[in-house]
């Protein structure tokens, strides 16, 4: 997607007009952000998806390449424009997002069937919900058939995910809002979060990893409930924090890191991303994360 970010003091209420502090354009889209996060962290990543045959589409391909991602599998649609997201960011760095899918609608099952070589090549499949459900389902099915680890970032969250899809997911990574929507349980504390996560595990998900912003991440599976605290930083813009977390998690798991270590690595990467404005422009590189990791070890020594 092409992201249009609007910065303001406070979000407007219904019927209210507020003055903005700035307007920016950056390359974005959840799948592209996740792929760029992997690439900048040293992962060997290839992205599948659809962009328009337009300036924004060409810029997206260039941005992915510059981040170390392989965009050769991307399809450029002659009939639909590159997707667009309008992102509202308040003074605390919190955001609300409206997505116009555009060419993302053409990322369907048939297109993915033509990319089977990449499904066989990879070790981790990272999915998100800005593409049609049929594509998400097919990718998860194919991943399970091939014995791949499937990570699903359920954003933007639908009212319900098919039980079949939940049963194909190794790591479901919602934020608190997405978890509440998918489970039907309004979370007002950790007990509610755990109950909501266990409801989804009861439908077949192996592990639910809830991203909690400045609080870190909560892992819930058949046996474990564990909170991974985040590094405390001054948040500027949370736009791509979840995408960064997912990309870093995938990179770490693909490298063979133990689960605990991989989640801590993802937390550190996301904590760096929120200190900068923008989506792909906010994503850290490997050296930055390792430097912060070293700082953390010194603090705990």
What are these regions (language model features)?
Residues 63-79:
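A glycine-rich helix N-cap at a beta->alpha junction
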């Amino acid at each position: 997607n092409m992201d249009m970010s609007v910065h303001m003091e406070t979000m407007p209420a219904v019927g209210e007009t507020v003055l903005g502090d700035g307007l920016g354009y950056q390359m974005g889209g959840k799948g592209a952000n996740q792929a760029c996060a992997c690439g900048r962290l040293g992962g060997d990543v290839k992205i599948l998806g659809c962009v328009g045959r337009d300036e924004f589409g060409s810029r997206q391909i260039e941005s992915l390449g510059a981040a170390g991602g392989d965009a050769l599998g991307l399809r450029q649609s002659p009939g639909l424009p590159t997707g667009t997201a309008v992102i509202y960011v308040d003074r605390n760095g919190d955001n609300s997002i409206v997505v116009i899918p555009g060419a993302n609608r053409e990322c369907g099952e048939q297109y993915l069937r033509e990319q089977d070589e990449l499904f066989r090549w990879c070790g981790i499949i990272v999915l998100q919900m800005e593409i049609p459900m049929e594509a998400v389902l097919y990718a998860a099915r194919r991943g399970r058939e091939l014995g791949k680890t499937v990570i699903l970032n359920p954003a933007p969250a639908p009212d319900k995910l098919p039980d079949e899809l939940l049963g194909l997911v190794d790591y479901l990574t919602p934020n608190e809002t997405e978890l509440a929507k998918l489970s039907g349980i309004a979370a007002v504390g950790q007990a509610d979060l755990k109950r909501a996560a266990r409801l989804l595990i009861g439908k077949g998900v192996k592990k639910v990893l809830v991203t909690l912003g400045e609080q870190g991440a909560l892992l819930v599976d058949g046996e474990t409930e564990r909170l991974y605290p985040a590094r405390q930083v001054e948040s500027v813009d949370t736009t791509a924090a979840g995408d960064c977390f997912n990309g870093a998690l995938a990179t770490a798991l693909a490298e063979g890191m133990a689960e605990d270590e991989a989640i801590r690595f993802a937390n550190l990467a996301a904590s760096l991303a929120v200190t900068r404005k923008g989506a792909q422009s906010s994503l850290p590189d490997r050296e930055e994360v390792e430097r912060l990791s070293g700082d953390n070890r010194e603090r705990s020594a």
